[in-house]
Amino acid sequence: MSEEKARVDNAATGDIQHQGKDIFFAAVETTRMPMIVTDPNRADNPIIFSNRAFLEMTGYSSEEIIGTNCRFLQGPETDRAVVQSIREAIDERVDISTEILNYRKDGSTFWNALFISPVYNDAGDLIYFFASQLDISRRRDAEDALRQAQKMEALGQLTGGIAHDFNNLLQVMGGYIDLIGSAAEKPTIDVQRVQRSVHHAKSAVERASTLTKQLLAFARKQKLQGRVLNLNGLVSSTEPLIERTFGPHVTIETDLDPALKNCRIDPTQAEVALLNIFINARDALVGRPDPKISIETRNLVVDELANMSYDGLLPGRYVSIAITDNGIGMPSSIRDRVMDPFFTTKEEGKGSGLGLSMVYGFAKQSGGAARIYTEEGVGTTLRLYFPVDEAMLTHAEPPKAVDRRIGSCERILIVEDRPDVAELAKMVLDDYGYICEIVLNAREALKKFESGSRYDLLFTDLIMPGGMNGVMLAREVRRRYPKIKVLLTTGYAESSIERTDIGGSEFDVVSKPCMPQDLARKVRQVLDGPNGIA
């Protein structure tokens, strides 16, 4: 915006009535663009002039608005932040251009493209504020319609992809379970055949679990177990994975910054993200002469001026890792969609279209960003950014093996609205030496306690029908019995336990699906913990 101030002739006094013959105001009066002038030297900065276009746009008469402040255009849905920015610009005597939802006299709304500028006389005195306006409702409606259409297209692609992949997995699980059932009815059991069926069914379950984690990663809803690590170390630890992914015919180069700062991310999800990038790079290299991959790490400072160049990263210090291939690259039409869930250019069965969307979601949920640079026929670079963490490196201990009989006959109340899920949890925990009872909702659970039953652990689902969720139940039971241990479970992974409308961060949680040994380990940790938080 130019620093040159708008000026009028020194004869201008601030009284618009004396300027009726001025060619400027004659032009303003006849233009089709709505315009008003206000007087900042009078109390409440009132309107002192409006042209016919403004009156037609708002439905008011000149007599109704002259001498009043412009706030009559505001209504209940007007953005207060935009109003505040306008006030600040007026206080600071600077130009402002914005879009605001305004109200006509009849109560109907319109989107107003507003430009306000101070006007000075030759002596440098502020005498007016000049505001030009434009009804842009049609443009905003068209933009909203386009966004809705795009959202519905994305939703259709997402739900179609989910249904396709889960139907395939359900086919595998159901088919092999039927084979196991048929084998159990025969007088002699082919143990190897049953074991193969069990293996394939479990493999399908694991793939389904991976699919939900990828979806949650894209939506930034997965539960991340962040710890301090160095990306250089992450690259070194995944070298065997890199070599297996690309094979001996691909040249792998690394350029790792020896002074690279640490970051705090989930190491398991980070490895999965890198694997997804490696797989896409490998597929892009098929048939290319002299295929090559380079891996680079760097420190980076993002300032306020540059943050939009880094996908809106907050100003601060970051570390980055970039994977570059000299593969086929992508046209812009594919580049712009490559991180959408279930978008894939691969043939059926070769990819789910969730790999890079998982990478994007993981980076975002970790406080960073993922950016892709590509040129068709030249290659692709995918760069991840994570905030610097000055804490020292930590090393996670491997989980200890779980004894098949780790329970000591502790009593557990299982609260789960799905009977099949509840029965499975009971069978698992019974096998580990616990005494379990099942109820299907929170009200039944409270009745159990009120009848005098005593339990060492309340194991409850988080989301349940009936008006009382798992957190509400846990808090009520803990209020009555402060020493009871509590473990929540949810299929929603991360944010249902931390959403402000549910809460519950004071309790430990185990995510579904959960392997029997993992559930047993978590139950033991909670029971042995001082306050039920492992």
From Swiss-Prot:
Q: Where is the Response regulatory domain?
A: 411-527
Domain PAC span(s) in chain numbering:
94-148
Record's function text: Photosensitive kinase and response regulator that is involved in increased bacterial virulence upon exposure to light.
Q: What is this protein called?
A: Blue-light-activated protein
| Catalysis performed (reactions) | ATP + protein L-histidine = ADP + protein N-phospho-L-histidine
The PTM S-4a-FMN cysteine maps to C70
Gene3D superfamilies in the record: 1.10.287.130, 3.40.50.2300, Histidine kinase-like ATPase, C-terminal domain, PAS domain
Q: Which PROSITE patterns match?
A: HIS_KIN (PS50109), PAC (PS50113), PAS (PS50112), RESPONSE_REGULATORY (PS50110)
Task: Look up the domain of life of the source.
Answer: Bacteria
Q: How is it modified after translation?
A: FMN binds covalently to cysteine after exposure to blue light and this bond is spontaneously broken in the dark.
Organism encoding this protein: Pseudomonas savastanoi pv. phaseolicola (strain 1448A / Race 6) (Pseudomonas syringae pv. phaseolicola (strain 1448A / Race 6))
The record, for Pfam families, names: HATPase_c, PAS_9, Response_reg
**Record lineage:** Bacteria, Pseudomonadati, Pseudomonadota, Gammaproteobacteria, Pseudomonadales
Q: Which UniProt keywords apply?
A: ATP-binding, Chromophore, Flavoprotein, FMN, Kinase, Nucleotide-binding, Phosphoprotein, Photoreceptor protein, Receptor, Sensory transduction, Transferase, Virulence
